[in-house]
């Protein structure tokens, strides 16, 4: 019996190594022991981890005020003041609502008659005016998962193409498969005007990429628990699904809506017919877009249920030459600064004359490609010199002139030796 007592005294916690006599209680398992102190420590660690996870997934982040969001957008996006204001307020209200629901909890809101509905956003405006960039910048400021989807790739369930649930898979992937984090993210759906009904009156033929897609999007826009295939593609009954609640996902849908200005003008009585009809002007069209009503969107081809789930409607305007020049130089990550940084990595300075910047902006206006076309023009102008510079150690500075843009003339090259002599003489 003595031996049994001695062996009992030698029992130790498998985690901290303390003996049975040093702790209040020792819990035995199959070949292992754990003391009460280690159990308490484990509980504290678990509580801390759960608190951190709750903080990340329930919106307990620092929510910037609308003016702060607007200021951040102002650093990156030139112009579009009305759109930036509308987005700042809408995004602030959305995440304020998410935080309120997460803090109070759905169980405690049952008796409360006030339930704040979700306000998704519709962005209307021509291509290359910053619609996608606005949404990306918002997600960057809020540090939430962000996914971009193309509405033209979507089809109604059962037809060749992508199901609407694949949009949610992109958001889950952006959140590194953290579903809880994805459920408070932002989804940007572009080219939504391309899924407008092909005719104003419903047709007896199936419109699988138009009205059918709008119908399929209704539930996830409003808020539902969707079954998402983890590998994408079509659903089949024998696969497992990821369950995603879209109640707190903010949807920003956008499109160019070409021809919508005519519908608005006709409704408002601003458009003539025949030889007396006024010619289209971009500035006039921009003003007309600001007067859009739900009935105009319905006439364009969006179904009333779809319009009703997009209560915040804002517009972006065509960028003029002055705005394009500012985009080249003013934002924090301006295109000119990006290329100057790339040249610096090769030990070369890059300089643009004022005339060159004006010509680049003029070319973008002429091509009607907006801000998106600026990078393509810069690549055309800088491509040949970027090919030569890495192999030429004598180049110290490259100056882009108006002729470099307009006439494809070679830029002005300043040798490194000349720059050194100028520095010494100074």
UniProtKB/Swiss-Prot annotation:
Segments passing through the bilayer: none
GO process annotations (BP): cell division; proteolysis involved in protein catabolic process
Sorted UniProt keywords: ATP-binding, Chaperone, Metal-binding, Nucleotide-binding, Zinc
Positions of the ClpX-type ZB domain: 1-54
UniProt keyword ATP-binding present: yes
SMART domains the record matches: AAA, ClpB_D2-small, zf-C4_ClpX
GO CC list: HslUV protease complex
InterPro entries: AAA+_ATPase, ATP-dep_Clp_protease_ClpX, ATPase_AAA_core, Clp_ATPase_C, Clp_protease_ATP-bd_su_ClpX, ClpX_bact, P-loop_NTPase, Znf_CppX_C4
Molecular function (Gene Ontology), one example: ATP-dependent protein folding chaperone
SUPFAM superfamilies: Glucocorticoid receptor-like (DNA-binding domain) (SSF57716), P-loop containing nucleoside triphosphate hydrolases (SSF52540)
A Pfam family recorded for this sequence: zf-C4_ClpX
Biological role stated in the UniProt entry: ATP-dependent specificity component of the Clp protease. It directs the protease to specific substrates. Can perform chaperone functions in the absence of ClpP.
Family under the similarity heading: Belongs to the ClpX chaperone family.
The protein, known as: ATP-dependent Clp protease ATP-binding subunit ClpX
Phylogenetic placement of the source organism: Bacteria, Bacillati, Actinomycetota, Actinomycetes, Micrococcales
Gene: clpX
């Amino acid at each position: 019996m003595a031996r049994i007592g001695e062996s009992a005294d030698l029992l130790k916690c498998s985690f901290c190594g303390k003996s049975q006599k040093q702790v209040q209680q020792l819990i035995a398992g199959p070949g292992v022991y754990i003391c009460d102190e280690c159990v308490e420590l484990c509980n504290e660690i678990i509580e801390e981890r759960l608190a951190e996870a709750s903080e990340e997934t329930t919106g307990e982040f620092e929510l910037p005020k609308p003016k702060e969001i607007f200021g951040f957008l102002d650093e990156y996006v030139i112009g579009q003041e009305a759109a930036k204001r509308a987005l700042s307020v809408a995004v602030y209200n959305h995440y304020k609502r998410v935080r309120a629901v997460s803090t109070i909890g759905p169980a405690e809101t049952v008796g409360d008659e006030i339930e704040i509905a979700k306000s998704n956003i519709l962005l209307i405006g021509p291509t290359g005016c910053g619609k996608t960039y606005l949404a990306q910048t918002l997600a960057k400021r809020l540090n939430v998962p962000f996914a971009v989807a193309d509405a033209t790739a979507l089809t109604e369930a059962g037809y060749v193409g992508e199901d609407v649930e694949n949009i949610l898979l992109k958001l889950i992937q952006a959140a590194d498969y953290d579903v809880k984090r994805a459920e408070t993210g932002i989804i940007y759906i572009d080219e939504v005007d391309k899924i407008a009904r092909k005719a104003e009156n419903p047709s007896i033929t199936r419109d699988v990429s138009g009205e059918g897609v709008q119908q399929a999007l209704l539930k996830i826009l409003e808020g539902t628990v969707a079954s998402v295939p983890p590998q994408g593609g079509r659903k089949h009954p024998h696969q497992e699904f990821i369950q995603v609640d879209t109640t707190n996902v903010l949807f920003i849908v956008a499109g160019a809506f070409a021809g919508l200005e005519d519908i608005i003008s006709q409704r408002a009585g601003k458009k003539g017919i025949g030889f007396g009809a006024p010619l289209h002007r971009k500035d006039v069209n921009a003003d007309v877009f600001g007067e859009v009503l739900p009935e105009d969107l319905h006439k364009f081809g969006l179904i009333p249920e779809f319009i009703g789930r997009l209560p915040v409607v804002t517009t972006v305007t065509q960028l003029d030459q002055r705005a394009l020049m500012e985009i080249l130089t003013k934002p924090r990550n301006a295109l000119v600064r990006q290329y100057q940084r790339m040249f610096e990595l090769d030990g070369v300075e890059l300089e643009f004359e004022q005339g060159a910047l004006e010509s680049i902006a003029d070319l973008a206006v002429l091509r009607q490609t907006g801000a998106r076309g600026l990078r393509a023009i810069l690549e055309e102008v800088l491509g040949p010199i970027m090919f030569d510079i890495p192999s030429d150690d004598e180049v110290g500075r490259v100056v882009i002139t108006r002729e470099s843009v307009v006439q494809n003339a070679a830029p002005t090259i300043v040798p490194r030796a000349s720059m050194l002599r100028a520095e010494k003489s100074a």
